[in-house]
Every structure is written in C-alpha cells, then in structure tokens.
Amino acid sequence: LGAFNSVVAELDVVCPTGDCDIWDRKAWIEAKGPDGNWIELIRYMTPYGRSCNHTIDLTDYLFMLEGNVEFRIFTDTWAGSWEYNLTLNYFAGEPEYKYGNAVSVYSGNYALGDYANLQPFEEVTFNFDDNIEKAQLNMLLSGHGWGNNNSNNAAEFYNITNQLYLNGDVINQNPWNDCNPNPDACVNSPQSTWYHDRAGWCPGMATDVEESDLTPYLTAGQTTATIDYGVLSGSGDSRYIANHQLVSYGGANFNLDARITDVISPSNKVEYSKEGILCGRPTIVIQNTGATTLTSLTIEY
C-alpha cells in the first residue's frame, strides 16, 4: 500500500442514446487481485431507463486498487444499453495496514425452496495466516425471483432474517431495503414499480455491503474461521445472489487510531432523511484503524 489511506468510487450510470433498458437489471463490477482472482467490488441494480450516479466507499479493497488494475463489468440485459463511468478518488495518508487480501467465500446463485437442498450455502472453514492482524467477512446479498407459485414473494420481496454462524456464534442478517425514497437518491421512471421494498436492493442502487468482524477470533487465539450461512426457505424461482468475501489485513501502521467513515446527522443523504436533521449533537460512524481496541474517543466539533 502506498501513500493513500482511503478510496471512494464515483459511479455514473448513463443512457448516452436514450434507449436504456426500461427494466431493473443486475450488474456487478469486479477487479482482479494480485493473486489473479476476481473480486466483486460493487453489486448494482439498474434504474428503470434513467441515468443515475452513486458514491461508494471502497477503502476495504485499497490494497488491490493501486498500480495497474484490471476491471470488468457485467449487466444482465439484452434490451437497450448502459454506459458506466467509474472514477476512483484517492485520499492521501498512511493506510491502516501495510498488507491486505480478499478471498471469496460464497459466490453465485443460491436457490431458496429447493426441497432437495434446503440449506444451499455450504459450511466453509478458513485457516488464518500467522501474519493476519485483522479480518472481516464482507457480505453482498440480494434476493431475486417471485410469483404466484412462490411463498411470500420470495426472494425479491421476502423480508426475512437469516442466520450467519461464525465458529458457532450466531449473527442475524436481514437483507432488506426500503426503496421509497431511493437510498441512493436515484429517480426512477414514474411508470415503474421502483417504490416496492426489496431484499437487499432497490432499482438504481449499489447494494450495501454488510460486515462481520472476525478479529475477536484472532485475538482469542483461534486459527480458523468456520462460516455457515443458514437461510429460511422460499419456493418456486427464488434465489439469493451472494458474494461473501473474507478480507484480511496485516502490518498495522498505527497502534491507536480512528477515522470517521460516515456522518448520519447533520446529513443531506436520502438514506438518512429521517435522522439527518440536526436537533442536538451530531451522529457519526467511526472505525478503529489502529491495532489497539478503542475504549474512549474525544471529539471536538
């Protein structure tokens, strides 16, 4: 890692000829890591025939976004066309760790409601390298498929809580998004159904990445992580599209450090529209960027 401590992507999705697909389509952007493996950085759902722009923090993958980087993009469409412009904005500073690595844990389509395989996510065990000082599980999950022969409109419109098992510990995950207003402030066509809430996505939105911290297992002396993802069943053509990654770091540059990753209030972000009006103290999200666990923080505002 070089002289940058964060990277933020600006994604512009445009209709240069005005004939963009009028339906929401799945898309994703991947980068090739130093080991030659492709890692999904952004999961995107296109808006209904409109142009939109998005801001996405990719600092978790800073270690693989320096130098000459190869990207590829896929959009699951056969009608109309889209143009994607991806700009990476780097911010000067010393990174949290000298080294990093990302490995796919789950990647692909996982059917819900297959009675021959009610738990499609297999159990996976990873060995931690001795040099790893921080690890986390980054989870990209979106639900798709629905219809009359389907229970509870799974998985696109099915609001359920799944269980992630990390070394036996249970972590609840609820892949669900309120789509009205659009979390990314993307204005869809009024003749569409963009306003329906969905499982982990909305039309014209970059899918949120949920993170689960694995570092406590390292500090407790454990050398492996056993990951098992349990899902509640739907039926019919229902499926999750998943890309879960084990991201690890080593060579901490700071013993005690922190950074502000988001400002909830005051904010003009649509996703914080209910909290963004400041009536008292500001609300922020911080990240521990040092090797020592934070126990207190002094903030001057």
Region locations from a protein language model:
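Extracellular beta-strand-rich recognition modules
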Residues: 9-11, 69-75, 135-139, 221-230, ...
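Extracellular/luminal regions of secreted and cell-surface proteins that mediate adhesion/ECM remodeling
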Residues: 240-241, 248-301
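Short structured motifs
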Residues: 55-58, 121-124, 208-212, 264-269, ...
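Solvent-exposed, conformationally flexible loop/turn segments
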Residues: 116-121, 220-221, 275-277
